[in-house]
């Protein structure tokens, strides 16, 4: 999996593609893609970084690993491709958005509109074998995505990090720059959403911070397709 980045992430992450962990990961992925069904498609692996450049990143919403069902994953955390049923966690995200802003719940889970406005939808692991959650955990992606977080941490311009659930909150140790903002709650999963995700108002908190910085707020409304 060579460096296919086309924006300002390319020079920042180029050294990672030469490191031993990444070369090992790349060999593993070449084998996996040739012998199993793996998501997302190879050309979509780095979509989070392609849609949201380093300089344009305002918000990071950290996910875990990609959806492992057919036609779901396309390289953005929580997002699914058009024409696919909205997964339960994303549906709860939409319910919270409806409660905050009054937006109708859309008929799709395609979050590219957020990514294009500076919301980096980053999973900590970027690939998965079909039907096997966490099957690519511990293969090297964590080193790579930790570096993405570290690079954003080095920025002077503030970033708002959204850490939902224990897995995302484990990355808080990488966010040491006091310029940045962290918004935490339990995960929007149906297992935990009622224990503190619903009512946490993350979207309006983000926009309040952006407005106070003089930045354009995020238009969170996802249109019907």
From Swiss-Prot:
Gene encoding it? ung
Q: Name one GO molecular function term.
A: uracil DNA N-glycosylase activity
EC number(s) on file: 3.2.2.27
Q: Specify whether Hydrolase is a keyword of the entry.
A: yes
Q: Does the keyword DNA repair apply?
A: yes
Question: One Gene Ontology cellular component annotation?
Answer: cytoplasm
Q: Which UniProt keywords apply?
A: Cytoplasm, DNA damage, DNA repair, Hydrolase
Mind telling me what this protein is named?
Answer: Uracil-DNA glycosylase
Q: Which residues form the active site?
A: 65 (proton acceptor)
* Described purpose of this protein according to its UniProt entry: Excises uracil residues from the DNA which can arise as a result of misincorporation of dUMP residues by DNA polymerase or due to deamination of cytosine.
Q: Which family does it belong to?
A: Belongs to the uracil-DNA glycosylase (UDG) superfamily. UNG family.
InterPro entries from the xrefs? UDG_fam1 (IPR002043), Ura-DNA_Glyclase_AS (IPR018085), Uracil-DNA_glycosylase-like (IPR005122), Uracil-DNA_glycosylase-like_sf (IPR036895)
* PROSITE patterns recorded: U_DNA_GLYCOSYLASE
GO BP annotations of the record are: base-excision repair, AP site formation via deaminated base removal
Q: Which reaction does it catalyse?
A: Hydrolyzes single-stranded DNA or mismatched double-stranded DNA and polynucleotides, releasing free uracil
Q: Which domain of life is it from?
A: Bacteria
Q: What HAMAP family is this protein classified in?
A: UDG (MF_00148)
Instruction: Read off the Pfam families from this record.
Output: UDG
Top enzyme class of this protein? hydrolase
- Localisation per UniProt entry: Cytoplasm
């Amino acid at each position: 999996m060579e460096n296919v980045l086309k924006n300002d992430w390319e020079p920042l992450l180029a050294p990672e593609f030469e490191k031993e962990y990444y070369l090992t990961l790349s060999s593993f992925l070449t084998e996996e893609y040739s012998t199993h069904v793996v998501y997302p498609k190879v050309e979509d692996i780095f979509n989070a970084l392609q849609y949201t450049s380093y300089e344009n990143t305002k918000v990071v919403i950290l996910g875990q690993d990609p959806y492992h069902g057919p036609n779901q994953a396309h390289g953005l955390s929580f997002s699914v491709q058009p024409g696919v049923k909205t997964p339960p966690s994303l549906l709860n995200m939409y319910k919270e958005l409806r409660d905050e802003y009054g937006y109708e719940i859309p008929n799709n889970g395609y979050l590219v509109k957020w990514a294009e406005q500076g919301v980096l939808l980053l999973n900590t692991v970027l690939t998965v074998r079909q039907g096997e959650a966490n099957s690519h955990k511990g293969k090297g992606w964590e080193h790579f995505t930790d570096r993405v977080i570290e690079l954003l941490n080095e920025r002077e311009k503030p970033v708002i990090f959204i850490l939902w659930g224990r897995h995302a909150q484990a990355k808080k140790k990488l966010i040491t720059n006091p310029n940045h903002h962290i918004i935490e709650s339990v995960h929007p999963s149906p297992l935990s959403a009622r224990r503190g995700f619903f009512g946490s108002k993350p979207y309006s908190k983000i926009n309040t911070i952006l407005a106070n910085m003089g930045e354009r707020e995020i238009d969170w409304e996802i249109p019907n397709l």
